[in-house]
Amino acid sequence: MKSLFHLLALAALALAPAALSAQTMPVQQPTPPDAAHRFDPPWNAPAQAGEAFTVYGIDNVPDLYGDVVDPQLVVFFGGNQFMVLDDLLREFRKAYPQYQRIFVETLPPGILAKQIEQGGALVVGNLRIALKPDVYAAGKSRMNMTPEWFARTSSYAQNRLAILVRKGNPKKVASLRDLGRPEVRVSMPNPAWEGIGKRIEDAYEKAGGAALKTAVMTTKVKAGTTFLTQIHHRQSPLRVLYDQSDAAPVWYTEAFYQAMLGHPVESVAIPEKENILANYVAGVMKAAPHAQAAEDFVTFLNSPAGQAVYQKYGFLPPVK
């Protein structure tokens, strides 16, 4: 299975400096993947100037996004929002054209927090990046762990859970309780560093009490029928698409996006009484190297243009 190392693999290409035009350094698209990697990310079509060298299964870095050289804004986003970036940054640049070189990471929020604690350093394969974020955005519970980091925070979106299954739902998964069945292979975010993992555990207890949580998170982990991911927003869809897992509890927007892509998946709704809401919060870092850019970006998230992007991808409006 594609691990964090596989999905992020080696170095992302730094974009050409802003002085180089698209005429001298044309936008290129990566070579389409072969059948064995036909569902591999990145799932967007990045319009970046430079020599395209994405090799699926080898050199493929979907969660490091944009300019690593002299960025004017650095954002650490919880990974489940990766799908908004193309539209969100395009609209942000329209509203604030002074910011063109932007670097974004969309990794699990717990990993991003560890990176911040190490001065912004991240090692992927042979690549080391050391960029301090201007903005850190994650679920409210994660943000509440480190209030001392932020000059200010702002809620900008909400989300809820769904269950991702293959087209046709071959195991007939109808509810969270079905994930406790021994024959249903589950892809589950690791609660150790993925905030969604703990929220899904809460949902298990709502749906089936401690017995369901124990079945999925203890009994089936030992049996090998629950797989704990390192980066669920990439691994869980891939495991379902490649028939390595039968079902994956995910954020609704992740299932929604896979359907937008035309991938052969379906979404199983979770009733409100068993579901949970996530409140996404963005914080301007006190130590932001680009403080004004951080302020402008967090303000933009709640602007009509910013909110329209989140609505397009199935997110709910923020807590008022």
Model-derived regions: residue spans:
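N-terminal post-signal-peptidase region of extra-cytosolic proteins
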Residues: 117-125, 145-149
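Positively charged n-region of N-terminal signal peptides that target proteins for export
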Residues: 1-4
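Bacterial N-terminal signal peptides
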Residues: 7-18
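Conserved hydrophobic/amphipathic secondary-structure segments
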Residues: 136
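Exported/periplasmic ABC-transporter solute-binding proteins
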Residues: 22-103, 107-114, 126-132, 140-141, ...
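Generic internal hydrophobic packing segments that stabilize the cores of diverse globular domains
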Residues: 12, 140-143
